[in-house]
Amino acid sequence: MDAPIGIFDSGIGGLTIAKALVERLPRESLYYVGDTAHMPYGDKSPERLNEYASGIAQRLTQAGCKALVVACNSASSNALGAVRNVAGPKVPVIGVVEPVVHWAQSHHPKGILSLIGTRATVQSGVYQRVTTK
């Protein structure tokens, strides 16, 4: 069997991404981690988010995952670099911020978009940085 794609979130919200992957990539196997022990991530410091996300990334890479999806806005906004460091250069790491911004800009090119997010996501400023690229 081929190596799985690892997905993690602070709870079960990332299951929507897992469902989309199953629909689009039906032959791929998935390894899902919902970190309910530390949820919610939205009220955690960037340092704590880096710690949690790095630990999960280590678990997923040790399980042989060929790619990682950080399906949590708070973790994607604050800990994507830490996850990439743990995963190493051979394991692609995908967060949710850039795909969301790309979708929003392609579907609403002239619109004003608002973000409703956790404190950790909003305070990271990542959506502002990505939309001004």
Feature-to-residue mapping (PLM):
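Non-catalytic structural scaffold of enzyme domains
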Residues: 1-133
